[in-house]
C-alpha cells in the first residue's frame, strides 16, 4: 500500500524521505481529497494485466511509453532530474505506473504544504491536471515507469507560478468543493 507523509522544510538531499518530526502520515483518503488516485498492480505482468487494461479502458488511457530514470539509461540525466524536481503543473493528468525501482512524488495540499508520496514497484498514481507537484528518485537512484496519457502525449510542464492557467482555476474550484 502507498505510503505518504507531510514533508519537513530541510534543504538536504532531495532523495531522502524528509519526514516531519513528529511524523504526520497522510492517508489514501486524504490524497483522494486532493484528486490523487492510486492503484496497486502486479508490475511483473504489466504487458498483459487485465486489471491494468480495465483501468486504461475506464479512464481512457490510450497512449503509453516506458521511461527508465538512472544515470546509465537517461540522456541528460542531471538536467532531467533537476527539471522533474522543479515545482510545476500540467494541463493534463499525470499518470505513472512504477514497473521497477522507486521514487517520490511530492504534491501540494490545500494549505500549500508538501506531501511526499513514496512510489515503488506495482504502484500506479494519477495526479490531477492543475496540481502543483514534482518528482525525484529516492536514494536507490533508479526507477522504471510507464507513462500513460489520454490521447496524444503532452510533455509540457509549467513551472510555478502558473496560476493563470484555466486548469489551475478548475483544480482550485475542485479543492474548494471538497471542503
Swiss-Prot record:
GO terms for molecular function: acireductone dioxygenase (Ni2+-requiring) activity; acireductone dioxygenase [iron(II)-requiring] activity; iron ion binding; nickel cation binding. It is a peripheral membrane protein. Pfam families: ARD (PF03079). It is found in: Cytoplasm; Nucleus; Cell membrane. InterPro entries: ARD (IPR004313), ARD_euk (IPR027496), RmlC-like_jellyroll (IPR014710), RmlC_Cupin_sf (IPR011051). Residues 1-21 are annotated as: Disordered. GO terms for cellular component: cytoplasm; nucleus; plasma membrane. GO terms for biological process: L-methionine salvage from methylthioadenosine; methionine metabolic process. Binds either 1 Fe or Ni cation per monomer. Iron-binding promotes an acireductone dioxygenase reaction producing 2-keto-4-methylthiobutyrate, while nickel-binding promotes an acireductone dioxygenase reaction producing 3-(methylsulfanyl)propanoate. This is Acireductone dioxygenase. It comes from Monodelphis domestica (Gray short-tailed opossum). The keyword Nucleus applies.
